[in-house]
Amino acid sequence: NIPPDVSFGNCCSIASGVRIFRANHPSGRFTTHPILYNPAMGYVAKDMLERPPLEIGHDVWIGANAIILPGVSRIGNGAVIGAGSVVTKDVGPYEIVAGNPARAIRMRFDERQIAALESSRWWELDRHELADRIGELDAMLQNPENPE
């Protein structure tokens, strides 16, 4: 179940068991019980929890059983989140993170390759165009200044 305030870019890979949480129980009140924020409990008229949106970029891979906690607002294009990771803060474009809490492991590509990928906007191609350009896009990573 993906919360309604979460948006995904194109060509994302989301493994099984991924959980995305958009709000925390209020820990500064007399109770953390849902009676304070959930209208289904019959004590409040509307949902009282703040749920800011989460934007997940294009070509993001979220590994099996990863958890994305409240407070995360952006996962950048091309990011990779390792299986079982607990993401507590934003993940940059093309950053590989893993662990509990998730920490940067390395970048997928160097700055020139990232710039070439971003300018190509390959994720906007229809499937036929993409199929025709796979070789060109792979070559671009080998020589980002001159993919021809």
Language model segments and positions:
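C-terminal segments of enzyme domains that contribute to small-molecule binding surfaces
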Residues: H33-I67, P101-E148
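Flexible, glycine/small-residue-enriched loop-and-beta-strand segment within the central core
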Residues: N1-I75
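Short conserved catalytic/interaction loops centered on acidic-Pro-aromatic/His motifs
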Residues: G76, D90-A98, M107
